[in-house]
Amino acid sequence: QGIWNDKLFPSWDSKYTCNINLEMNYWPSEVTNLSDLNEPLFRLIKEVSESGKETARIMYGANGWVLHHNTDIWRITGALDKAPSGMWPSGGAWLCRHLWERYLYTGDTEFLRSVYPILKGSGLFFDEIMVKEPVHNWLVVCPSNSPENVHSGNDGKATTAAGCTMDNQLIFD
């Protein structure tokens, strides 16, 4: 994809897939002392944290910001494509982990101060949209899904769920 794409209609529309693909490309950067390579990712995170405010407000009636499964050069943040992947609202939370990793590796408090509004906005979104699970009263993200995973439902296959483990871990982080 990117400059290597020779297709008029490329796979995934050449979007950034934020349910592991984009994140995985940057995992080695801090641990290999190549922190500067994160700058394009950090710019993307800042931009989707801005466009994601509108998505949070319109789709969820919530403050903060949200990024679903994909974004692109226009920094779209809403649910798109198919339900097994597109309805997942935790792409922004996962990308925030990269901001936190930068701080953990560098101890740069100025950097942390500069990205704190982004981290806070993602947390605020989840604080406002989580609901109580009816049996145990746990707070869970709903609706959600485990991206690209289809599970057995009452009447066949289902994708939308409440309290997916992936969401729980990302919010915990």
Where are each of the predicted segments found?
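Acidic/histidine-rich catalytic neighborhood
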Residues: 121-173
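Substrate-binding groove/exosite segments of carbohydrate-active enzymes
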Residues: 1-114
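Alpha-helical scaffold segments in carbohydrate-active enzymes
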Residues: 44-47, 51, 118-129
